[in-house]
C-alpha cells in the first residue's frame, strides 16, 4: 500500500475546499456512523472525498464501496465525480494498481432489484421479473375485484375508492413487513370471542369491520400472488421481497458484506421502513456503514419514511 494520504492533501489535488469538520468525516474509522448534514453543507463533496480517501489509503477498491441515493440523476453525477477525481489521484501517483475506478453508486430501488436478480430464486422469485408501474397495478386490482365473488364482502364505498383502499392497504402492509396471515388469525380469534355476544350496534360494527379486514387481506394477498405468478413486480414488491430475502436468507448478507467493504447511504432521512429492513439485515452487524442525512429535509414521508430514522441509526446499525 502507498504512503498514507490525508483528506486535506486529496482536496488539494482535486481542487476541493474542505473544512476541519469535513476532514473528520472523511477520515473517520471503519465503523457505523451517521452524519447530520443540512442543505448547502457540502455533503456530496464530503461523500465523494470519503471514497477517494478510502481508495487512496488502501482500505477498499472502488468496486468494494457501495453508494446508495434516491435518484438516478444524483447517482450518476456522484459516480462520475468520484471516477474523475480518482483518475486525478492516479495520475498524481497517489493510487497504485490498475484496478477499475468505477464505484457502484445506484438508487436504493436499483440495489433492491440487484438483490432480487442475484438471489431471488431462494424465495421463488423469478430473477427476470418484469417491473410494472402504478397504472398496471391499478388495472390488475380492478380486474381482481371485479372477479371477486363473496357474499360476505360488502364495501359501501365507490369502486374507485375500493381500489384505492386495497392498494393503500397492500402498500402499507408491505412497507411495514406486516404478516397478512397473522392479522387474519388475530382478527378471527376476536370474532370467535365476540360471536356469542348479544347483537348490539357496537358489537355488530366490530364484527363487520373485522370481516371486511379479513377479506381485504385475502384480496391483497391474491393481488400480490397474481403478480408473482405472472413474473411481474411493482416497485413496492421489489423492496418488500428484497427486505424479506435479506432477513430470511442469511447467506445473502454474508455475500453482500464480502462484496462491499464499505457502504455509504445518502439522504438517509428519506429511507423507508422496508429499505431499512433490507439494509440492516445486510449490513447491520457492525459493518462500516456511513449514513448522511438531514431530518429537517425529509421529503418522502408518504413512502414510509419516518421522522425517527436518523435518531434510530445507532440501534439499526450498532457499532
Which stretches of residues belong to each language-model region?
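Catalytic glutamate of the conserved HExxH
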Residues: 267
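Hydrophobic positions in the central parallel beta-sheet of the AAA+
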Residues: 35, 256, 263-264, 290-291
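P-loop NTPase Walker
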Residues: 1-123, 226, 254, 308
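Conserved RecA-like helicase ATPase core segment
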Residues: 2-10, 14-15, 43, 52-53, ...
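Conserved helicase/translocase P-loop NTPase motor core
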Residues: 109-112, 212-262, 272-278
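Generic alpha-helical segment signature
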Residues: 44, 134, 159, 209-216, ...
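ATP-hydrolysis module of ASCE/P-loop NTPase motor domains
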Residues: 98-102, 120-217, 228, 260
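A cross-family signal for key residues in well-ordered alpha-helices
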Residues: 26-27, 243, 280, 311
Amino acid at each position: 500500500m502507498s504512503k498514507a494520504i490525508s483528506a486535506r492533501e486529496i482536496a488539494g489535488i482535486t481542487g476541493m475546499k474542505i473544512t476541519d469538520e469535513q476532514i473528520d468525516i472523511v477520515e473517520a474509522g471503519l465503523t457505523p456512523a451517521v452524519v447530520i448534514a443540512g442543505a448547502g453543507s457540502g455533503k456530496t463533496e464530503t461523500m465523494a472525498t470519503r471514497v477517494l480517501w478510502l481508495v487512496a489509503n488502501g482500505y477498499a477498491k472502488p468496486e468494494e464501496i457501495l453508494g446508495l441515493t434516491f435518484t438516478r440523476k444524483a447517482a450518476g453525477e456522484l459516480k462520475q465525480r468520484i471516477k474523475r477525481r480518482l483518475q486525478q489521484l492516479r495520475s498524481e501517483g497517489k493510487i497504485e494498481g490498475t484496478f477499475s475506478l468505477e464505484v457502484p453508486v445506484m438508487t436504493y430501488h436499483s440495489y433492491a432489484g440487484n438483490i432480487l436478480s442475484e438471489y431471488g430464486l431462494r424465495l421463488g422469485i423469478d430473477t427476470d421479473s418484469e417491473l410494472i408501474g402504478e397504472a398496471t397495478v391499478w388495472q390488475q386490482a380492478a380486474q381482481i375485484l371485479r372477479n371477486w365473488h363473496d357474499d360476505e364482502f360488502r364495501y359501501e364505498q365507490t369502486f374507485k375508492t375500493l381500489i384505492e383502499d386495497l392498494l393503500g392497504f397492500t402498500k402499507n402492509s408491505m412497507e411495514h413487513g406486516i404478516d397478512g396471515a397473522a392479522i387474519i388469525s388475530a382478527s378471527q380469534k376476536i370474532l370467535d370471542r365476540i360471536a356469542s355476544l348479544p347483537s348490539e350496534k357496537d358489537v355488530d360494527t366490530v364484527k363487520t369491520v373485522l370481516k371486511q379486514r379479513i377479506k381485504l387481506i385475502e384480496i391483497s394477498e391474491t393481488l400480490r400472488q397474481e403478480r408473482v405468478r405472472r413474473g411481474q413486480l411493482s416497485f413496492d414488491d421489489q423492496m418488500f421481497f428484497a427486505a424479506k430475502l435479506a432477513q430470511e436468507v442469511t447467506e445473502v448478507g454474508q455475500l453482500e458484506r464480502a462484496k462491499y467493504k464499505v457502504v455509504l447511504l445518502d439522504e438517509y432521512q428519506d429511507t423507508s421502513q422496508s429499505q431499512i429492513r433490507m439494509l440492516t439485515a445486510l449490513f447491520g452487524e457492525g459493518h462500516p456503514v456511513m449514513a448522511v442525512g438531514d431530518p429537517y429535509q425529509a421529503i418522502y414521508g408518504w413512502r414510509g419514511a419516518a421522522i425517527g430514522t436518523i435518531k434510530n441509526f445507532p440501534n439499526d446499525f450498532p457499532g
